[in-house]
Amino acid sequence: MKSLKIIPVFTIVIAMTLSAAAQKDKSKRPSPPVQVSKSVNGTTVTIDYSQPSKRGREIFGGLEKYGKVWRTGANETSWIQVSKDVKVEGKKLPAGKYGLFTIPEKEEWTIIFNKKWDGWGAYEYSKEDDVLRVTVPSNSTDEIVERFTIDIADSGEVSMAWDQTQVSFSLK
């Protein structure tokens, strides 16, 4: 009789263990993680982010409100790491790892490099932790980009595209 009572408890423990293991497999998320890395003039630049999908939604000005700090992807805070000091749009960014946040606007975006890189989304974002902010133009595209994508060109141009919006900043 005692063994019959143990079976449901054992089943629950196994189910919880399997569920926890599945959650650790980030590749199965609706917004899977991506990491891009490139050597730019002898500096290794790595960007880690998750790729949300458009899925028929209006993205900028809709899902992601204009004028609000955005995590620049999905899930955990997106981050960028540079192995040496670089210039971002002509402004110095010391070597290190930074949270990559943005403030989308219709005509221009603010790109933010923040001390807080290890968190969930932009919930723990604080302007006081900003290391550098640059403003760049926002461009409309004819083509719809379904998944948010960040690319690093050999020249050091970092490009972000989603829906019908594309934004770039230079890293030298």
What are these regions (language model features)?
Residues 71-119:
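Mid-length scaffold segments of soluble, non-membrane domains
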